[in-house]
């Protein structure tokens, strides 16, 4: 009833949600594990930064995502204050820190990913029952250590209580011109996808050599 333009924008937002379902599901798992809120005030990232306490619009989602929603009409550029460290703008892969401005496009909800994060993303699909053939891991450069979690199970039933789940812990480390990505896995569940792509974001130099074990 709002016209094709707005229908398409709503469709894009819904499809983005489905692409980020691995992050959403893992955020729910972390909440059941230790009570971590899935959506948090920015002060959770650094309680000692007084500027973060003043931010009312933006919020943290899951382990490593910061969302800066557009809540006013006709906004073309939006100011954002980021917690300490580098954060990558998802749509461009550009790193930023502190106070900055981003260009606002109607079909791109502004959000950032923390440096060192491993962000699991599904391909575009229309419903949760659709077969998922591959998973993409967006790996964000950081000079230092970081960890990320990906939790998966059948999505229904109680078999996860007897070990039928998959928990992957990703550990990244950038140091002296090298970068390592390690994975530890727990649980007996095997996800349906057979292919995993790795997409490197923000690396300061061209990758000259890659070693897989």
What is each of the regions a protein language model found here?
Residues 1-203:
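Catalytic core of carbohydrate-active enzymes
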Residues 204-213:
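A short amphipathic beta-strand at an alpha->beta junction
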């Amino acid at each position: 009833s709002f016209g094709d333009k707005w229908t398409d924008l709503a469709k894009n937002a819904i499809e983005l949600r489905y692409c980020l379902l691995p992050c959403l599901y893992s955020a729910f798992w972390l909440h059941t594990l230790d009570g971590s809120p899935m959506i948090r005030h920015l002060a959770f990232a650094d309680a000692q930064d007084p500027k973060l306490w003043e931010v009312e619009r933006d919020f943290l989602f899951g382990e490593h995502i910061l969302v800066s929603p557009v809540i006013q009409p006709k906004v073309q550029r939006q100011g954002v204050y980021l917690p300490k460290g580098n954060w990558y703008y998802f749509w461009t892969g550009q790193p930023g820190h502190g106070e900055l401005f981003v260009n606002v496009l109607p079909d791109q909800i502004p959000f950032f990913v923390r440096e060192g994060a491993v962000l699991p993303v599904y391909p575009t699909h229309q419903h949760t029952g659709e077969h998922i053939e591959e998973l993409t891991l967006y790996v964000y450069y950081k000079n230092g250590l970081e960890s990320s979690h990906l939790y998966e199970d059948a999505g229904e039933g109680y078999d996860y209580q007897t070990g039928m789940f998959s928990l992957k812990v990703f550990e990244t480390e950038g140091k002296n011109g090298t970068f390592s990505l390690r994975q530890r896995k727990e649980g007996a569940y095997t996800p349906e996808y057979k292919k995993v792509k790795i997409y490197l974001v923000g690396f300061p130099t061209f990758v000259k050599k890659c070693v897989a074990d």
